[in-house]
Swiss-Prot record:
A single GO BP: glycogen catabolic process
Catalytic activity: Hydrolysis of (1->6)-alpha-D-glucosidic linkages to branches with degrees of polymerization of three or four glucose residues in limit dextrin
Family: Belongs to the glycosyl hydrolase 13 family.
Marked site positions, Transition state stabilizer: D443
Protein name, UniProt field: Glycogen debranching enzyme
Length: 658
């Protein structure tokens, strides 16, 4: 290898051209940048990056090839009060690294210093960036581009979804490969979901606190390298990218989209006592929101917050998203704590990152889903994200639980949430699909636990049950825990059926948590982020097959109802919806606000949802005509009902006009 040539300022990261590697690094405040390369024995050689265009440092290393391990040492001021924490003794990861060798361990050498710099070299223990080649044969792969009106999302964890699946080869369980295996593809198709939304797959780290407790970060919301796949779910680290792309290709062939949960709000460097392994040492002042005293704004609850209004960081975020779309063919993103994306530092719909995404021909055409809050002041922004974003709708989640489980909720509030929360999302030209309706998600109780536990049981997390929300809107139906007498178990089953029907037959985009269709329980743990064990892994051998069949039938039914698949707002008299009382008459103003939880929802003038959310059996008079209950509420040969449905307590039934 020779000394570095000046190279080019783009593309960002380490790019192999067949003859050598071009390296670039953004740092607005650095005074000097050293590229450090390592041989197979760990010997280090350093080169100054000779070029600088604007805030991008660059150089070209002739003869370098894929597999080369490298990092950076960045020189600049140590001025903590001004937000500058340069420390060239610390080897740093390339923020654009496509592969990383080594884990982020709880090691004293990885700390850059608090008030004074830590002068101990960390190269022996620091993770290393690795040069890769992105070549891959996509064959005839094409994005499914499922319309929002027909989209049904399935949220899953790469490992937890398949680790215990008995029909998969042992060696691929819990891996990217398993996602595209014919057994899983067939299951997704039988269930009827159209999009697989994966918890974070970008390489992440376990927080030092968890490592000291013998736990790991299971969910993955602690990002370490945003362009690199988490290697633990591949047959070998160097195969992660191809195995993930193989899975995407197989899912696309089956018409299933792949959506990634992505964490663009903070990094695994955490607070000032956390490790310094990348952004803090590269350009702390640019990458993070810094307070006047030099500490971090902690709007994420994770110690730091990425400054996504800084031009260099906006470019970093957009290039990251484009990488996943262009290199891995993913179909969209769910953004964790997405209010951070709009902070300037107050939330703005025209924030720089939103504007950049909207202007990008690649990103503006994929599915974009916001978790529309963070923990900072003004962080709750449900309904306020600009097009083309959809948003998780916590109003729907809470209303569905409060309606069917013993909580106070009016019929009017329930109907509003059933109709895609038009009071929240019908603005800025957005369609009903902007409301991503959910009952449960990775964060919180599973659906089964919603009907079995009144209180969270998070003792296994090591925080004395202090972590996790206390606002669960759950109901154990009379006994805390999974067991109980037959009549109690039947009431729980009825509640689960009613909740699933509400989710899958309401307007908006439904999201189903993987395992809810099995009856999966986390035994009351509503914050299982650190439980990489049987508590979170889906037990396919214990799955409730009847509940899976029920869920699949609901999804098939949904796809038959034009009022749900059309993705247009319901208007008075358009034939999409009529709201009726138990006597098949329009609901009165008093019934909307004060009436019993009894109603009928007529969709597309052909499908009738009869609802009895009271504690008593109640006769419900159906509208004129011949009505037949449809699967999953009856068999195909179910007799016609012409007048009255005897609605059981906490009961729901769907009829089709003859």
């Amino acid at each position: 290898m020779t000394q570095l040539a000046i190279g080019e300022a783009t593309p960002h990261g380490a790019t192999y051209d067949g003859h050598g590697v071009n390296f670039t690094l953004f740092s607005a405040h650095a005074e000097r940048v050293e590229l450090c390369v390592f041989d197979s024995r760990g010997n280090e050689r350093r080169y100054d990056l000779p070029g600088r265009r604007g805030d991008v440092w660059h150089g070209y290393l002739a003869g370098a090839r894929p597999g080369l391990r490298y990092g950076y040492r960045v020189h600049g001021p140590w001025q903590p009060a001004q937000g500058h924490r340069f420390n060239p003794v610390k080897l740093l990861l390339d923020p654009y690294a496509r592969r990383v060798e080594g884990e982020l361990k709880d090691h004293p050498l990885l700390h850059g210093g608090h008030d004074e710099p830590d002068y101990r070299d960390n190269a022996a223990v620091a993770p290393k960036s690795v040069v890769i080649s992105d070549h891959y044969d996509w064959e005839d792969d094409a994005a499914p581009r499922t319309p929002w009106g027909k989209t049904v999302i399935y949220e899953a964890h790469v490992k937890g979804l398949t680790y215990l699946h008995p029909e998969l080869p042992q060696e691929i369980r819990g891996t990217y490969k398993a996602l595209g295996h014919p057994v899983m593809v067939a299951y997704f198709k039988q269930l009827g979901i159209t999009a697989l939304e994966l918890l974070p797959v970008a390489q992440f780290a376990s927080e030092p606190r968890l490592q000291r407790m013998g736990l790991t970060n299971y969910w993955g919301y602690n990002p370490m390298a945003m362009f690199a796949l988490h290697p633990a779910w591949a047959s070998s680290p160097e195969m992660a990218l191809d195995e993930f792309r193989d899975a995407v290709k197989a899912l696309h062939r089956a018409g299933i989209e792949v959506i990634l949960d992505i964490v663009l709000n903070h990094s695994a460097e955490l607070d000032l006592d956390g490790p310094t392994f990348s952004l803090r040492g590269i350009d702390n002042r640019s990458y993070y929101w810094i307070r006047d005293d030099g500490d971090y704004h902690n709007w994420t609850g994770c110690g730091n917050t990425l400054n996504l209004s800084h031009p260099g960081v906006v470019e970093y975020a957009c290039e990251c998203l484009r990488y996943w779309v262009e290199t891995c063919h993913v179909d969209g993103f769910r953004f964790d704590l997405a209010s951070v994306m709009g902070r300037t530092p107050t939330f703005r719909q025209d924030a720089p990152l939103f504007a950049a995404i909207k202007a990008c021909p690649v990103l503006s055409t994929v599915k974009l889903i916001a978790e529309p809050w963070d923990i900072g002041e003004g962080g709750y922004q449900v309904g306020n994200f600009p097009p083309p974003f959809a948003e998780w709708n916590d109003h729907f989640r809470d209303a569905a639980r409060r309606f069917w489980l013993p909580r106070n909720l009016t019929t009017g509030e329930f109907a509003c949430r059933f109709a895609a929360s038009s009071d929240v999302f019908k603005r800025n030209g957005r369609a009903p699909g902007a409301s991503v309706n959910l009952l449960t998600a990775h964060d919180g109780f599973t659906l089964r636990d919603c009907v079995c536990f009144n209180q969270k049981h998070n003792e296994a997390n090591g925080e004395e049950n202090r972590d996790g929300t206390n606002s669960n809107y759950s109901d154990n139906h009379g006994k805390e825990g999974l067991g109980g007498p037959l009549d109690l178990m039947e009431r729980r089953r009825d509640s689960i059926h009613a909740l699933l029907a509400t989710l899958l037959l309401s307007q908006g985009t439904p999201m189903l948590l993987a395992g809810d269709e099995h009856g999966h329980s986390q035994h009351g743990n509503n914050n299982a982020y650190c439980q990489d064990n049987a508590l979170t892994w889906l037990d396919w051998q214990q799955a409730n097959r009847g509940l899976t069949t029920f869920t699949a039938a609901l999804i098939r039914l949904r796809q038959q109802i034009p009022a749900l698949t059309g993705n247009s707002w319901w208007e008075e008299g358009d034939g999409n919806v009529r709201w009726l009382n138990k006597n098949a008459q329009p609901l009165s103003a008093d019934e909307w606000q004060n009436g019993p939880k009894l109603m009928q929802i007529l969709l597309s003038d052909r499908f009738l949802i009869a609802i009895n959310a009271t504690l008593e059996v109640t006769d419900i008079v159906l509208p004129e005509g011949e009505w037949r209950a449809v699967p999953p509420f009856a068999g195909e040969d179910n007799p016609v009902i012409t007048a009255v449905w005897q609605g059981p307590a906490h009961g729901l039934c769907v009829f089709q006009r003859g």
